[in-house]
């Protein structure tokens, strides 16, 4: 096993699985936040993926998984090969009744634009079969991975594929890259007007660049980062949460604002969410 691969295992009443994280090629560091492979079986039926401020390339190397559209009527959409999940402003419910073997590439907020070269607001809040956007090349990548048993070699194969697809003429504007980094560094607490002033653009022009190259407005991305910051603090506590202090620390107007944002991004109040099983920082068990 190379020093680029780190594997974690989990076993508890909610299931058993392993997650391997790959240290990404430096040439991809501007666009890729992480690469990972998860495999195992859960004891629960359904989970909810929470907004993260990242988009995902997901390659299914195991049994079918399902995205659940709430309806009514409720619809289970199967995913069996390769798909792309854009930046989301709400939760996604999923099921993996037969276990999973999933390789993922998490893109930074501005990381997909140099790779797909499309308007990102056309892909936000959407999940698409990648073959619909890229043709059969996405499916041939999956076939190569299925025929490559070593995990390290699988990650290297995906890296080569990503590097080959980079579009030199599709470059993220430096102001967008800087603003995305500032939003992340401040936990979403920097005012959009300050971002515009410091980039030298009007708020409208910066917003248009964000819609094109990120897929969300600066304000929407900042809301996700504020939520993630509050969620991290909630996870690190001992169950006795001073809600008003948490709201102030994370940049919310008051406790009511915090609760409303949690309901928007998770479907639960903070207190309800804290009582639920959490397989990882990105999801919550529904049933």
Locations of the language-model features?
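Ser/Thr-centric signal marking residues that sit
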Residues: 266
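Hydrophobic alpha-helical segments, especially transmembrane helices
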Residues: 204-205, 224
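DNA major-groove recognition helix of helix-turn-helix
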Residues: 210, 222, 261-263, 274
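Alpha-helical bundle regulatory/interaction domains
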Residues: 1-203, 213-218, 232-253, 269-287
């Amino acid at each position: 096993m190379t020093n680029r691969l780190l594997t974690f295992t989990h076993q508890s009443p909610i299931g058993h699985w392993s997650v391997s994280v790959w240290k990404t090629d430096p040439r991809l560091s501007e666009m890729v936040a992480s690469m990972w492979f998860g495999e195992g079986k859960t004891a629960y039926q359904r989970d909810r993926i929470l907004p993260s401020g990242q988009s995902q390339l997901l390659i299914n190397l195991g049994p079918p998984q399902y995205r659940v559209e709430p309806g009514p009527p409720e619809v289970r959409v199967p995913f069996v090969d390769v798909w792309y999940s854009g930046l989301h402003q709400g939760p996604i419910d999923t099921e993996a009744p037969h276990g999973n073997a999933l390789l993922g590439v998490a893109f930074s907020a501005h990381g997909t634009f140099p790779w797909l070269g499309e308007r990102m607001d056309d892909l936000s809040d959407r999940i698409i079969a990648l073959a619909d956007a890229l043709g059969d090349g996405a499916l041939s990548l999956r076939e190569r991975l299925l025929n490559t048993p070593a995990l390290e070699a699988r990650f290297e194969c995906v890296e080569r594929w990503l590097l080959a697809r980079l579009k030199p003429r599709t470059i993220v504007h430096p102001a967008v890259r800087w603003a995305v980094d500032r939003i992340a560094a401040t936990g979403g607490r920097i005012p959009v007007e300050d971002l515009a002033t410091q980039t030298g653009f009007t708020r409208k022009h910066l917003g248009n660049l964000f819609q094109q190259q990120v897929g969300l407005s600066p304000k929407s991305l900042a809301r996700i980062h504020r939520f993630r910051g509050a969620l991290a603090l909630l996870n690190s506590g001992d169950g006795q949460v001073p809600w008003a202090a948490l709201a102030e620390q994370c940049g919310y107007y008051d406790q009511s604002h915090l609760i409303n944002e949690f309901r928007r991004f998770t479907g639960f109040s903070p207190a309800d969410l804290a009582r639920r099983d959490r397989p990882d920082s990105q999801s919550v068990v529904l049933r």
